[in-house]
Amino acid sequence: IRDEAHDATLDIPFKGDIDVKKLEKLINEKGAENIGYVCLAVTVNLAGGQPVSIANMKAVRELTAKHGIKVFYDATRCIENAYFIKEQEPGYQDRSIKSIVQEMFSYADGYTMSGKKDCLTNIGGFLCMNDEELFMKAKELVVVFEGMPSYGGMAGRDMEAMAIGLKEATQEEYMEHRVKLARYLGEKLKAAGVPIVEPIGGHAVFLDARRFC
């Protein structure tokens, strides 16, 4: 991720963006043939729940496509990421959360998702990809480790709950309420003199342990 993400006091948007120049340097040094895929987390938990911009997703996609490298998202909090894009990235204010999520995934070859975050369920997850050959390989492995490809060891009840949760989480009112709850807590902590990671992310408030001590 970009260097600015490591400065907990810097309050700027999209601190989860990948440094594309560093990524290109890494590809040139290691060789594209030695890189299985690039993983882009949306949002970035490591940096305090910071979002990734559409502009950065496009830039990463263009670079990796040039080298024949796949891009997979850690999409566990992708709907939160879409909310931040709508709120902060020029040109997206009038777009629906759902349409922004769809555009985000148009720049990826696949993604992993935990059901316990933006899907609003207590269990499960899933893996998606647009490469049929890769899908067939994954399909063979899931039988060995999890269950049949159609359910992966999950109960039908949980898969249905996950589908409903995804639909409900894209409602702007819900996501706005959730993000602003985190901001409310963060602002209260700041007012009390507690150092936190800024800007406040979508799902949690992270303490700045170095300054806190």
Write out the residue ranges for each language-model feature.
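Conserved PLP-enzyme active-site core in the AAT-like
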Residues: 1-196, 207, 213
